[in-house]
């Protein structure tokens, strides 16, 4: 993991087209701005983890239900 120190107004560039800028520091909270191409998803980690959890739940399948799945109605 790369660890950097930044001050308000300073930025970090990732690749050629992603910029992370420090906008405000207030106590223990830091406000950042992220400029990235529209095709790059930018999510808070807790939201990303929740989406992964929901996706895993959505694909759970109980094999015991398989025989009835193909019955003609």
From Swiss-Prot:
Subcellular localization: Cytoplasm
Predominant location category: cytoplasm
Keywords for the protein's UniProt record, in alphabetical order: Bacterial flagellum biogenesis, Cytoplasm, Repressor, RNA-binding, Translation regulation
SUPFAM superfamilies in the record: CsrA-like
Gene3D superfamilies: Translational regulator CsrA (2.60.40.4380)
Keyword Oxidoreductase applies: no
Biological function: A translational regulator that binds mRNA to regulate translation initiation and/or mRNA stability. Usually binds in the 5'-UTR at or near the Shine-Dalgarno sequence preventing ribosome-binding, thus repressing translation. Its main target seems to be the major flagellin gene, while its function is anatagonized by FliW.
PANTHER family: CARBON STORAGE REGULATOR
Quaternary structure, from the entry: Homodimer; the beta-strands of each monomer intercalate to form a hydrophobic core, while the alpha-helices form wings that extend away from the core.
Protein name: Translational regulator CsrA
Annotated source species: Thermosipho africanus (strain TCF52B)
Encoding gene (name): csrA
